[in-house]
Amino acid sequence: MKPLTRPATLSAQVYQAVADEIVSGRLKAGMHLRQEEVADRLGVSRQPVQQAMVMLSLDGLVIKSEKRGLYVAPFDPELMQKHYDIRSALDGLAARQAAQRLSFDTFLVSRIEKLGEGILAKGRAAISQSNIVAQITCDEAFHHLIYDVADNPLLATSARIHWQYLRRAMGEVLRHVESPQNIWQQHEAILSAVVKGNSATAEKLALDHTSSASKRLFEAYKDIGLPNEKVVGKR
């Protein structure tokens, strides 16, 4: 890890640094998180680390135990499915409302299309570089673009907690699937439907996209066995 700067936002930076390590798999389920070591690696005091650990605990990425202290939360596919179910509903609604808006606000169409294509290009570049964290960041950016176009601020707010948790699920999937390009083909199809103002198609594609993501997660879990509660209990 690189030393962090900008003291006013240190706790948020520590949060993101640790979350990225969990998402990337560098910090695995059950691994202890000693605040002194995290602070030393990041070049910060313990206070922002403590604050970050509270946020990580609230988002389900870290668990605090009286006996074990702080450790990376186990991978829970059933809980992941619940998060995917809610995100699916939000993403379907967002795609439909975004397409409806662009169907009568043609001034925005070319701008949104350009922004979307830029994110698609970055996502595909991240695949070619085998950069999982960057792939997830671009994936999240794409969906937040759709939230923004839908012009419903409650969508992004409601989706935030699910995205924080599902970033980890996405990391697990991307480490174990052979064709992440399919994800970006689906994004491209959603974008196309949105900019064409085809609300029914956009909604269906968004729902199918989240459903396939959930399916990939469970296939990876079944095929190779991702870390779970039992694994953690044996450590």
PLM feature spans:
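A short secondary-structure junction motif
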Residues: 21, 25, 122, 162-169, ...
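Hydrophobic residues in alpha-helical segments
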Residues: 22, 98, 102, 123-127, ...
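Conserved amphipathic alpha-helical segments that form helical-bundle/coiled-coil interaction surfaces
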Residues: 78, 83, 105-171, 185-189, ...
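Long, hydrophobic, amphipathic alpha-helical segments used as structural scaffolds
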Residues: 98-102, 150-158, 170-177, 217, ...
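C-terminal regulatory/effector modules of DNA-binding transcriptional regulators
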Residues: 41, 174-235
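Short linear motifs at protein or domain termini
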Residues: 1-104, 218-235
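Hydrophobic recognition helices of helix-based DNA-binding modules
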Residues: 18, 94, 98, 146-150, ...
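Short helix-capping and inter-helix turn/linker motifs at the boundaries of alpha-helical repeat units
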Residues: 9, 114, 133, 178-181
